[in-house]
Design a protein with these regions (language model features):
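Short acidic/polar alpha-helix capping motifs at helix-coil junctions
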Residues: 8-10, 29-34, 61, 241-245
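Hydrophobic residues in beta-strands and at strand termini
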Residues: 11, 39-41, 143, 166
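Conserved ATP-binding subdomain of kinase catalytic cores across diverse folds
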Residues: 26-40, 45, 71
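Helical "lid/coupling" subdomains associated with nucleotide-phosphate turnover
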Residues: 20, 44-72, 85-93, 101-135, ...
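Acidic donor-binding segment of Leloir-type glycosyltransferases
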Residues: 98
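Gly/Thr-rich phosphate-binding beta-strand-loop-beta motif of the actin/hexokinase/Hsp70
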Residues: 2-30, 132-161, 218
Length: 335
């Protein structure tokens, strides 16, 4: 059996991770190792639009460690992607140069569209579930660190996709000062989220009857730990999801960490992401929610497997492009 080893590196806003995969025609894509470092890069870049020198050096230390692990595994190929935290940094080019000099790793900065498309490919790789769900009107809600992407599907194709600057890390950073000084900061957080979400609903969702909802994002693996709320590991009802939100709604970060068995820097992202997801539920008629644990690294592995002719996606992405273009032309009365 011919197989190759591939390393996917994700420099995110709240953590850095590397996943090692074995890829073959016979057995597809298999994860064999996963290394994760909590590193809040977005905390500085979302506020100051620059990566501090100390953060650059810490990032290089972590990436150098990744490079040594890749040598141990005799990796055939790798990709290293950075997302919104570096995308929004004014000194991003200097940071990438420093990383290359210190670690030998070439890091590429993804645009928002590229990032979401790669995650979308990871979903499409789970074709049996994904293709069945999107036959009916479906909202895919991807809550990232810096923003949220809402994509609508119908009859198996993508209809439209919209982005709002409501990410879990961004919201958490903006609310952190208030949490110490204001008693009702959770209500203020909800108002802040509503400012963009209500507009999104009015412009793009209100006329749509959405039957299914797919939630993806950095915090999804934390949610599915709450096994009492889920059916078959990845499915949860509207009522159970809202019951979960009620359980954590007025809890402190320390209490959420205890309830969900998380570190505090992970727990502080739960309430912001849950409130965005819940607001989307309010705009739909969906009762069942699918929360697959797909990541950017998974999508990177899918892309590599496609490139090396070891994996083929069944979903028709060209049909998505045509359907989306048609939708835009109709919206602006273009013939």
């Amino acid at each position: 059996m011919a197989y190759s080893t591939f390393a996917a590196i994700d420099i995110g806003s709240s953590c850095m991770e590397m996943v090692i995969y074995e890829i073959s025609r016979d057995y597809g894509i298999k994860e064999i190792d996963h290394i994760r470092h909590i590193f809040e890069l977005g905390k500085s870049t979302y506020e100051k639009r620059e990566v501090d020198f100390e953060d650059v050096e810490k990032m290089c230390d972590i990436l150098y460690g990744f490079s040594e692990i890749m040598k141990d595994y005799c990796i055939d190929d790798y990709r290293a992607f950075a997302t919104s935290a570096l995308r929004e940094a004014r000194n991003a080019v200097r940071v990438l140069d420093r990383i290359k000099v210190r670690t030998g790793i070439d890091v590429e900065i993804l645009s928002n569209s590229e990032q979401r498309f790669i995650i979308y490919k990871a979903l499409a790789a789970r074709s049996d579930k994904f293709n069945k769900i999107i036959e009916k009107s479906t909202a895919l809600v991807d809550v990232g660190a810096g923003s949220t992407q809402v994509s609508l599907f119908n009859n198996g194709t993508l209809v439209t996709t919209q982005n709002v600057k409501l990410g879990a890390v961004r919201i958490s950073n903006m609310m952190s000062a208030l949490s110490q000084n204001v008693a009702n900061y959770v209500d203020i957080m909800r108002e802040y989220i509503d400012n963009d979400m209500v507009t999104l609903n009015e412009l793009f969702l209100r006329s749509k009857k959405i039957s299914n909802v797919i939630f993806v994002g950095d915090c999804v693996p934390y949610y599915v730990r709450m096994k009492d709320y889920f059916d078959d590991g990845e499915y949860i009802t509207r009522d159970r999801f809202k019951a979960f939100l009620d359980k954590i709604y007025h809890k402190s970060i320390e209490q959420i960490a205890d309830i969900m068995m998380l570190q505090e820097n992970q727990a502080k992202l739960i309430l912001p992401s849950a409130m965005v997801y819940t607001r989307m539920l309010d705009f739909t008629q969906a009762d069942a929610i699918w929360m697959p644990q797909v990541t950017l690294c998974d999508g990177m592995a899918v892309e590599h497997a496609q490139k090396t002719k070891k994996f083929e996606l069944k979903h028709d992405f060209n049909a998505d492009i045509l359907a989306t273009a048609k939708n835009i032309s109709q919206r602006y009365s273009i013939r």
